[in-house]
Amino acid sequence: MEPLRVLELYSGIGGMHHALRESRVPAHVVAAIDVSTVANEVYKHNFPHTHLLAKTIEGISLEEFDKLSFNMILMSPPCQPFTRIGLQGDMSDRRTNSFLYILDILPRLQKLPKYILLENVKGFEVSSTRGLLIQTMEACGFQYQEFLLSPSSLGIPNSRLRYFLIAKLQSEPLCFQAPGQILMEFPNSGTVQPQEYAVVEEGKLRVRTREPDVCLDSSSTQCSGQDSILFKHETAADIDRKRQQDSDLSVQMLKGFLEDGDTAQYLLPAKSLLRYALLLDIVKPTSRRSMCFTKGYGSYIEGTGSVLQTAEDVQIENIYKSLPDLPPEEKIAKLSMLKLRYFTPKEIANLLGFPPEFGFPEKTTVKQRYRLLGNSLNVHVVSKLLTVLCE
């Protein structure tokens, strides 16, 4: 097969390019496009020979796109208009303009690409922009399938639920195509229960999710006390859920993704321990889970990602239950016994599936690295979807 000519839009730090390499699909990236100077420096550091265009997508004419003669598009449009914690401006958000421009010129290309892969946040699937994307796919004659997938389904101890669309220009449906449904598992990964799909009802997309079973004791007929706070801000249900995750042997332990070197600079400062102790999501090297790492990791605490307890022999419950009656200095001393630290940028890159040789230019600051990784994607998930798409 002739190598595919790939156009990489919103190329960032090259997650799509790394996924393409990992998939072993014969391909050549004819152009990568991004406006971020910092991201482009990282991309160039890892792919020095790729044609990188540091310009807006709207600044590229239809004729210029035609000259690139690509037959695959990989893209991860800005997610901020669709995030659950954002304003959800959707089409009215100016950051959506470049993607709307792509949807406008796609049908007007001299030659349509054969393959398309798109990644975005959960929330995109219920946006008006997604509706326009689907209309465009159908008008152009693409067969497509949508997914909501997390790296944990590949045995990676990290939650990062993301929306994906893969599309192929052909008349026959994809062999795994489920019209009007969003698959919650990879094709050919076993039987998918109907409740694990998203379904369309009365023209509206609705995602069905299974309620977590928090009653681990089969002798109990009800979850009494599941909502009461035990320690930190965690209920018995929260603790049971985390224990279930940590006992899932299909998922790797975090220790396989950690660095061996000196990580003292990543220890949480005393003021963060004192102020945010009850908000921290704490994991150990033996844990089989971690929260999604966002671009605010390292700068903000709540909801930006897990922190690592490196003093594994210290019982976290005992520490937290002793805190309420202590003065601030003693609280800090107690919490310091856990030796909590941030995951390093390299460790987050490992969890995101970037290869060992992936790196940053020396001048890229730690804060910038966290931000870039938080805006990136999981390489392994995209790689598997590319393999499925090009089979």
UniProtKB/Swiss-Prot annotation:
Belongs to the class I-like SAM-binding methyltransferase superfamily. C5-methyltransferase family. Specifically methylates cytosine 38 in the anticodon loop of tRNA(Asp). Has higher activity on tRNA(Asp) modified with queuosine at position 34. This is tRNA (cytosine(38)-C(5))-methyltransferase. PANTHER family: TRNA (CYTOSINE(38)-C(5))-METHYLTRANSFERASE. Keywords: Cytoplasm, Methyltransferase, RNA-binding, S-adenosyl-L-methionine, Transferase, tRNA processing. InterPro entries: C5-MTase, C5_MeTfrase, C5_meth_CS, SAM-dependent_MTases_sf. Residues 4-391 form the SAM-dependent MTase C5-type domain. It catalyses: cytidine(38) in tRNA + S-adenosyl-L-methionine = 5-methylcytidine(38) in tRNA + S-adenosyl-L-homocysteine + H(+). It is an enzyme of class 2 (transferase). The lineage of its organism: Eukaryota, Metazoa, Chordata, Craniata, Vertebrata. It comes from Rattus norvegicus. The active site is at C79. One of its GO terms (cellular component) is cytoplasm. S-adenosyl-L-methionine binds at I13, G14, G15, D34, I57, E58, S76, S376. One of its GO terms (biological process) is response to amphetamine. GO terms for molecular function: RNA binding; tRNA (cytidine-5-)-methyltransferase activity; tRNA methyltransferase activity. SUPFAM superfamilies: S-adenosyl-L-methionine-dependent methyltransferases (SSF53335). It is found in: Cytoplasm. Its EC number is 2.1.1.204. It holds the Pfam family DNA_methylase.
